């Protein structure tokens, strides 16, 4: 176990050569800090109505990069556990992660992933490639497989701006299964309980070369459709002024859209739904 010596200095393990993975360091010296490593007792499964779960997140590539968004609802069974949960987080300057699944484990995984990327860059002197970032996150998901099989799954969605990609291909999207299998997606993807409805909406609305405004509206429309058919997904809450989180990554780095911009776009979308409740149709 990592500890300080009696003189208040760091222990020898902090100066022992090893790889650049902070997760591997914790596993070797402080495994108790890795919440995704433990298993429930044999035969015990998590009760879904006792643990908050995040629901729908999505991403789509657009003209200047990639957009990632998520609704704000967390549920415990048929109860709303939280109305303003933030499921979209920057991982570093050019990468972001959103999650669906068990909230407590997901938030721990996101924080550890942020440290993992920063630690690698400090040790190696260069940032990871985007593919390596996806592989590293896949490994962290795989470490949670035991708990996932007992009902405590975390399913993240990773997006990044690939500085080394060809023009028009900078925005990249990766999804994962509960075993840690990484899958690069083309154009758009969604995860969580409302994802079938969100993907259906994005199939209608997505087109190459979308502007930031078009991409943001498409994401909001998709989340609205998901909330319309999936009770675990939250739509825009006009009365409480709680709206989806929408962020973009471009050559300038990660940016979360201001609340005022997201609110204006959400209100515009809801107003359009007054005359067309099922939302816009696909362009012919």
UniProtKB/Swiss-Prot annotation:
PROSITE patterns: PROTEASOME_BETA_2. Residues 1-54 form a propeptide. Its EC number is 3.4.25.1. Disulfide bonds: none annotated. It comes from the Bacteria. NCBIfam families: 20S_bact_beta. Component of the proteasome core, a large protease complex with broad specificity involved in protein degradation. This is Proteasome subunit beta 1. It comes from Streptomyces avermitilis (strain ATCC 31267 / DSM 46492 / JCM 5070 / NBRC 14893 / NCIMB 12804 / NRRL 8165 / MA-4680). The gene is prcB1.
